[in-house]
Amino acid sequence: MAAKQKNYATETFTDPERIRNFCIIAHIDHGKSTLADRILQMSGVVEDRDMRDQYLDNMDIERERGITIKAQNVRLPWVPKTGAHAGEELVMHLIDTPGHVDFTYEVSRALEACEGCILLVDAAQGIEAQTLANLYLAMENDLEIIPVLNKIDLPAADPDKYALEIAHIIGCEPEDVLRVSGKTGEGVSELLDRVCELVPAPVGDADAPARAMIFDSVYDIYRGVVTYVRMMDGKLESRQKIQMMSTGATHETLEIGVVSPEPTKTKGLGVGEVGYIITGVKDVRQSKVGDTITWAVNGAETPLKGYQEPTPMVYSGLFPISADQYPDLREAIEKLQLNDASLTFEPETSVALGFGFRCGFLGLLHMEITRARLEREFDLDLISTAPSVVYRVVKEDGSEVMVRNPSDWPGGKMREIYEPIVKMTVIVPAEFLGATMELCQSKRGQMGGMDYLSEDRVELRYTMPLGEIIFDFFDQLKSRTKGYASLNYEEAGEQLADLVKVDILLQGDPVDAFSAIVHRENAHWYGNKMTVKLKELIPRQQFEVPVQAAIGSKIIARENIRALRKDVLSKCYGGDVSRKRKLLEKQKEGKKRMKAIGSVSVPQEAFVAALSTDAD
């Protein structure tokens, strides 16, 4: 490596003409973090000896699952060797975005902070549904789009075929699609030169009152909330009083700086720059993502175009396995919420599982990751109940109830029930088209249309109830398409539905943890599945236990757990049959009495196993 050059990017108040803000949009596993690693290395801000894979993914769980969850940002120096700006010292801000469907909200924030984006597509797989969704978001924001094929070093890569596919989608020429390899570094410097040439410089009024947009905030144990901002107008300096425009709260900036690639303190931030602000606030909800920061005195009048607050789509109960971990769970969720503004929670009690929390998530992956982080980072053992969505129930008297939890389902007659629906896009290889359409139909999907992206890849569009997707749709889709399908969905309002609440009764008593709201057609299937499952999982008692599934007072499925019997005749060697009968009658009476007063204890493992979704 050449002698280490001075990182001039750590100096702020750069002339906006020399700044380029861009992000990378890609599907999971298309090599975005690897490309970001190469960019960091080539610009010289990370020395080879400090390099580690997925440099920007700080959470263990991100590195382990190979996905990016939080948007990270880095400020880099770059001197292009080609193009109109060859030889100029430019400053680039790379904002790394997550690629998963649940985190579309995080992507939309990162896009607001950029003027251009690199559309990164795996040269062996082609464009995926979620990448398409994020690409349309970028187009809505009028970003300059630079199409790139990654992983051209792979033996299975077919860059010519996929260059045509991308050109067809975004309307460029196939030869405009750049070819790079994040792994070997081939083509990366040409890509950065192209970014400098095509991405427009940020525009803003340097003399106007400051307006900075928050696009992320993270919680640091030592310094409180670190807020990442993009300056639109004016400038911010340290030791300055600032105001959050949505809440009106005022703070003082204790430290202001840039990430290059470690946080570096600077004098302040000017137009078009991306950096961080620390105010010593301890609550992330004080610095809401999408909010505008301005000066507390003589500040801006109008805030920047904000975002929508993220709305939870999926709800699930989280309960500690041992009741004494409840305070720890509360503390842990509060700490996670500091970093994750889209997580909502409220206390909940369950007869079967004790005290816990009803949490709202953006989607299934968000739920899984939150649970994994709670268990790993805070050392908790948790049970999560089956996920559910929000239903709107209109009762007979016209009053409305929002049902987030099966136990809130109103009794009596109901006039109308509405369930949330989503518009879903699935991209599958043509050979799996039949199996995929069959699956979507079985989940009450209505087809909206289909397009062939190339001769062997099809895009399907469906409208489908969200409740059908959250359970095991994704797993089934992957297994029917050998893992080649990709899926994206966005909310699309609600529709009337014929839904019922199925209760699972043990010895005539409902167990709230197993209740579910399902479509009337699927009620028998769910009832049979749960009763059979519980029959296997609950240990046999001294008396017979009926396991029933019911809709209201109507029983729709039943299994019996046979009683354990002691052999009362073992001491009778021969003798009169009436003696044997007397002993058996006595045992029968005892069992009857036990059944009347006995209660069934359900072991923890049975809850965990019964609530875990499976493929059947």
From Swiss-Prot:
One of its GO terms (biological process) is positive regulation of translation. GTP binds at D29, H30, G31, K32, S33, T34, N150, K151, I152, D153. It holds the Pfam family GTP_EFTU_D2. Its main location: membrane. The keyword Cell membrane applies. InterPro entries: EF-4, EFG_III/V, EFG_V-like, EFTu-like_2, G_TR_CS, LepA_C_sf, LepA_CTD, LepA_IV. It is an enzyme of class 3 (hydrolase). Residues 17-203 form the tr-type G domain. Required for accurate and efficient protein synthesis under certain stress conditions. May act as a fidelity factor of the translation reaction, by catalyzing a one-codon backward translocation of tRNAs on improperly translocated ribosomes. Back-translocation proceeds from a post-translocation (POST) complex to a pre-translocation (PRE) complex, thus giving elongation factor G a second chance to translocate the tRNAs correctly. Binds to ribosomes in a GTP-dependent manner. Belongs to the TRAFAC class translation factor GTPase superfamily. Classic translation factor GTPase family. LepA subfamily. This is Elongation factor 4. It comes from Corynebacterium jeikeium (strain K411). The lineage of its organism: Bacteria, Bacillati, Actinomycetota, Actinomycetes, Mycobacteriales.
